[in-house]
Amino acid sequence: MDPTCQESPAEDSNNEEDLDSTKAAPRIRDTPEDIVLEAPASGLAFHPTRDLLAAGDVDGDVFVFAYSCQEGETKELWSSGHHLKSCRAVVFSEDGQKLVTVSKDKAIHVLDVEQGQLERRISKAHSAPINSLLLVDENVLVTGDDTGGIRLWDQRKEGPLMDMRQHEEYIADMALDPAKKLLLTASGDGCLGVFNIKRRRFELLSEPQSGDLTSVALMKYGKKVACGSSEGTIYLFNWNGFGATSDRFALRAESIDCMVPVTENLLCTGSTDGIIRAVNILPNRVVGTVGQHAGEPVEELALSHCGHFLASSGHDQRLKFWDMTQLRTVVVDDYRRRKKKGGPLRALSSKAWSTDDFFAGLREDEEEAKAPEEVSGESDDDSD
């Protein structure tokens, strides 16, 4: 497998003379090629150490792909059709040997990563369709369902360790603090939930926000919690101040359907308009765009183990890869320049505004001509 997340050594020019002139050298791309599925993927996860990407689609099928920047080397390793309905989430275990999946069919599956064999099935894990999944450690996991139910599981035991229903709507996303003590839940009822999974008790619900909370992430070294919403607003909470928001700001997006942290200050959001936005937290700025799904809603985002690639799934049935190198060099300051209203978002990758992989390299010269600069005026809106 091509070490995609490692820099390739420079080739000796003398070796090139020994190559058969009739053989073209394999093309090395900035990112792996798009993966085309037969149905949109609603679950997406990178392997913790290897160049593998798992996807679960709305037909209930689960796939594992080996990806590479060498053209023609990205390929499917195996697929599984054990779920009866849509696969909602996929997560690799910490050691990368297992893949856990959950589904609208209310089941939890544990698969062997090497062969794709089903090792364990919990058929009726919830009384309602399961919508979200989070692994706590190699044995413990948390699931959330469409009616607001949350269950804590130990794979070495039968039945859930904890079963709570404090939310009134579906559990959209979950996050865990570094100590693996507090579970944070984003729900369709507009509330952020806090659960102590060490003591197996409910702590509190935040005040309801406008619209569904669709995603949750810890930022600023755990000092802030960011929640995306169906109204296109990011809500910020102080750690240990979960009752009410400390800040908020609206993106020029119909919704925020998914969200993934890239650094402690930067995150990426996927929206119904198909645009993947890079957002800085405090100061709150929309830095630019790293890519798009050509007007099709973005369903899920995931960051590779090396941090170089962002993967996205959309309703166009494609899995796309985006280069995060340029985004990581962006510096955001507190000074605000006036930005032309309605202007295009800054492109943060060579194919950010391309609708086809064929055009991936056409913007490279333009982007390279721009020296790295401090971004200070890319916000769509002021924070309250």
Curated annotation (Swiss-Prot):
Positions of region (Disordered): 1-33, 362-384
SMART domains in UniProt: WD40 (SM00320)
One of the GO BP terms on file: rRNA processing
Chief location category: nucleus
Recorded superkingdom: Eukaryota
Keyword Cytoplasm included in the entry's annotation: yes
WD repeat feature ranges: 36-75, 82-121, 125-163, 166-205, 208-247, 250-289, 293-332
Subcellular localization, as worded in the UniProt entry: Nucleus, Nucleolus; Cytoplasm
Residue stretches of biased makeup (Acidic residues): 9-19, 375-384
Phosphoserine, modified sites: 354, 383
Keywords: Cytoplasm, Nucleus, Phosphoprotein, Repeat, rRNA processing, WD repeat
Cysteine-cysteine disulfides: none
InterPro entries: WD40/YVTN_repeat-like_dom_sf, WD40_repeat_CS, WD40_repeat_dom_sf, WD40_rpt, WDR55, WDR55_POC1
Family, similarity comment: Belongs to the WD repeat WDR55 family.
Function text: Nucleolar protein that acts as a modulator of rRNA synthesis. Plays a central role during organogenesis.
PANTHER family: WD REPEAT-CONTAINING PROTEIN 55 (PTHR44019:SF20)
The name this protein goes by in its record: WD repeat-containing protein 55
